[in-house]
Design a protein with these regions (language model features):
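Short N-terminal "domain-start" leader segments
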Residues: 1-20, 25
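Non-catalytic signal-transmission and effector/linker regions of two-component phosphorelay proteins
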Residues: 7, 61-62
């Protein structure tokens, strides 16, 4: 069972941040912090980043 690395949280201004659960810091994609998102964007991005992270870990353990 793989533990998801990324999750999302609602900020005080109503926007959403995708963050790394191990560091608590906002995720970066191509150097851009993933904050100020709407809920749908954040939810889709969490799914994508977790999928890519799981694939990366599977490849390194082969």
């Amino acid at each position: 069972m793989h533990k998801n690395r990324y999750d999302m949280r609602k900020e005080n201004d109503g926007s959403w941040t995708v963050f790394d659960i191990f560091t608590g810091l906002p995720a970066k994609v191509k150097g851009v912090l993933q904050d100020g998102l709407d809920m749908e964007q954040a939810d889709d991005l969490v799914d994508l980043l977790n999928y890519l992270d799981i694939k990366r870990r599977e490849e390194t353990h082969r």
